[in-house]
Amino acid sequence: MKKILMTSALAALALMPASAQKVSKSSGGYPITPVPFTSVKVWNNTFWGQRIETSRKVTIPLAFSKCETEGRYKNFERAAHPSEKYDVGKLMPLSFDDTDPYKTIEGASYVLQTYPDKKLKAYIDSVLDIIAPAQEPDGYLYTARTQNPKHPHFWAGDKRWSMEEDLSHELYNLGHMVEGAVAHWQATGSRKFLDIAIRYADCVVREVGPNPGQACVVPGHQIAEMALCKLYLATGNKKYLEEAKFFLDYRGKTSIKQEYSQSHKPVLEQDEAVGHAVRATYMYAGMADVAALTGDTAYIHAIDRIWDNIVSKKLYITGGIGATNNGEAFGKNYELPNMSAYCETCAAIGNVYVNYRLFLLHGESKYYDVLERTLYNGLISGVSMDGGGFFYPNPLESMGQHQRQAWFGCACCPSNICRFLPSLPGYVYAVKDKNVYVNLFLSNSSSLKVAGKKVSLSQDTQYPWNGDIAIKVDDNKAGQFGMKIRIPGWVKGQPVPSDLYYYSDGKRLGYTITVNGKKVEAKVTEDGYYTINRKWKKGDVVRVHFDMEARTVRANNKVEADRGCISIERGPIVYCAEWPDNQGFDIMSILENREPQFAEGKLSYDGFIDPKYKNVLTLYKGQNMETLTENVQTLAYDKSGKLSTKDQTLTLIPYFAWAHRGNGNMKVWLPQDVKAAKPSAPATLAAQAKVEFSSPVPAKSSITDGLVPADENDRSIPYIHWWPKKNTTEWITYTFPESKEIKTSTVYWYDDQPWGGCKVPDSWKLYYQDEAGNWKEVPGADAYPCKRGVACIVNFDPVKTKAVKLELKQPETHSCGLFEWSVK
C-alpha cells in the first residue's frame, strides 16, 4: 500500500491511496480540504514555534518516561503472559491506562514527520514490541482483561463487552489505538502498529453490532467513531465506516440510557450538550465524520443544533466547556461557575475537533472564531509553557487550590496534549476548489495544492501580540485563485457567535488589507472571509492589519456567576489578574472602574519556565508576553462593619500564563458593579491561627477564608481533602497567637458523592490544649453532626486555650474533606 501523509493530526479526512480516494469522493467527504500539517512549517522562536518545540523536547519524552515509571508498559508485559496471580485492579488502577502509550506514540509520530529522529523511531518500535505480544490470537487487545482473564479489572466485566457501556473502555482503547496506529504508519511507512490496530478493529467488527450473536453495545466513552472513520479512509475498507455509523445509530437504543454518556436519547434527537464533556465532543466530531463520509445530512442538522446550544449557553469566555466536576460534565444552560469550572483540557481539545469539522462542512468563519478562542486560552492553559506541567481542569478563578501537575493517575490530558500540539500546523489553511482559506495567523511556510497545482505561502507575524500579518506568495503554479482571509469575531465586535458574551466598552475596531501596498477591491462575504480573487505572482505580499487593543466583555445576564463583572481581552487573548503581579492587596476584593483605561506593557518569560528544562529556556530567551495595567479600587470592611476603598494599580496577564509562579489568587471575571464585589473582611480567629495538618492537603488556606457553600450541592468554593487516603484518622490544629476563650465550632464538610472519592467522616471530635500542653476533648459537647455542605455546629462548655484540634475518622472506602472550620 502506498505511503501517504495525514491531512491533519485529528481530521477525519486524509490524503489516501488512490482506491481510498475514490471511496471518499463517492461517499461525500468534507467539501473543504484541510492542508496537511506536514505541509506547514511553523517558524522557530515564535509563539507557536515555541510551543511545538517544547512538546517535542519536553512533553512527549516526559509522557514516555511516565509510561515506563507508572507501569503502563508492564500491563502489556503481564498480558503477554497471563496469570491468575495478578490482582489487576491493584496493578492497573484504570481500565483505559493502555491509551497513554497509544496517544503518546501518536504525538511522537506527528513529530517524526516534521523532525525525523532515528532514536525516537527506534524507541517507538521498542514500545510496539511490548504491545504486540499482549494481543490475543483473534485480535482482542485489552490488558485490563487479558492479564488475568478469570479475574479481570473490576471495570472490565465477566466477559468481553459486558461493561462497555459502563466503565470497561474496551472501545475507547480501540479508538486511541487506531488513531495512534494510523499516525505511526503515515509517519514511518511501517505497518507494525497499523496491523495490530486492524486486527483489534476486525475483532470489534465481528463481535460488536446489531446482528444475532453480536454484542449490541455502543462505546461508553466515545472516540471509536472518529477513529474507525480514519481507519476507513486509510484502508478503503467500508466495514469500519459502517461500524462507526452503527455506534451512532444505536446510541440511545441499547440497554443503558443516561445523559452522562449521551445515550439518553438517539443522537439525531439530541439538541443540547449534556453529560461528560469529553465524551460529548468526541461523539459530535464522530457524527461530523460519518455525515461527511456517508452524506447523511440528519447528523449535520443534529450537530448544528448542539453547537448552537454550546456557543449560546454553555461556552466559557476562555473557550472551555464543562461546568462541573460532577461527572466532568456540561452544566445546565447558562450554568458557568468560575472557581469550580471544570473546563477539562481534553474537553478543550474536543471543542477544537468539533469546530474544525463544522468549518470543513460549512465553510463559515464563526467556527474558527470559537476554535481560536479555545486554542489561545482554555486549551494551552492546560500545559505549562515549559511543557512539564499539566492542568486537568482549567478554572477561571482560584484561591491557590489549583496547580499544574507533572502527571495524573488518570493521565488523559497530558497524553492528549502530546498528540494535539504537534498537529497544530494542520489547522492553519484549507482549500476548496480555487480558494485558499487562511484561518489562523502564525509565522509559517507552507506548500499546498490549488486545483492540483502547487502554491507556496508564508506568514510573518507577531500575532497574538499584535494584529499585523504579512502573507507572501512564495510560488504559484495555480494562476488565479481566491485568498480567503478570516476576519476574527473579536475584530468585528462579536466575542462569540451568539449573545452569550458581548463587548461592553463601545469601541469599534477596524482592519486594513493591502496587496503590494495597494488597497484592493474586495469585501467580507457572508461566510466571514475577506476574499481577494486575482492571478497571484511570486513575491506578492498581502498585508493585514487588525486593530488590537484591550476590550471589556460582559456575559449574558442569565449567567449568574458573571453578573456585574467584566472580563478583559486583547485580540484572541483573555486576561486575568494573578497574585504575583499585584502584591500588597487582595485581587479578590477589587472593583473595576465604570470606564477602565488600560496601558499595555511587556513581561519577560523569566520565572515562567522551570530552570530544570534548560533545553526550553533558550526558546523563550529575549521573548515577552503582553500585559495590561489599569486603575481599580479595593474594598474592605473594618471591625465595625464600615466599608472603605483604596486606589490600586492592577496588572493583568494572559490567562494561559497563570499558575506558573506558585499558588495564589487568580481571577478572570472582575467585579464592575458594587453588588458583585467581595470586600475583604477582618481576620477571624481561625484566620489568625497557625494551621497544621496531619498529612499534606491541597488549598490549606481554604478552611479559614470565610467562604462557605450555599447549599449541600455547592462545590464552587475551595476546600481541603485527604484523598486518596482512606480509613485513617486525620487532624487539623489551630494555634492562636495568645490564649482565647472558645465555646463553639462550625465545620462545613465536603462530600462529592455519588461520583467522587470524598464523604463526610464516620465521626469527629474537638480537643483543646491545656496549660500543660496536653490534648483534652472539649467538655460538654452537645453533638458532632456529619452532614455535607451545611453548617455542622458543636457547642461546648467554654475553655481557654492556645490551641484547638479537629480529629476525624475517615470512612473505610472514602476520603474526607472540608470547606471551612471556624471557632468562636
Predicted regions and their residues:
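Predominantly extracellular/luminal regions of secreted and cell-surface proteins
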Residues: 679-713
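Asp-box/WD-like beta-propeller blade repeats and closely related beta-sheet repeat scaffolds
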Residues: 147-168, 194, 199-215
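Short, surface-exposed beta-strand/strand-loop-strand elements in extracellular ectodomains
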Residues: 172, 496-505, 510-515, 755-772
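Aromatic (Trp/Tyr) and acidic
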Residues: 22-118, 122, 152-187, 222-239, ...
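Aromatic, loop-rich ligand-recognition surfaces of beta-strand-rich domains
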Residues: 678-681, 713-779, 784, 788-824
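C-terminal beta-rich recognition modules with glycine/proline-rich loops and embedded aromatic residues
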Residues: 244, 303, 369-377, 382-472, ...
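Bacterial Sec-dependent N-terminal signal peptides
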Residues: 1-22
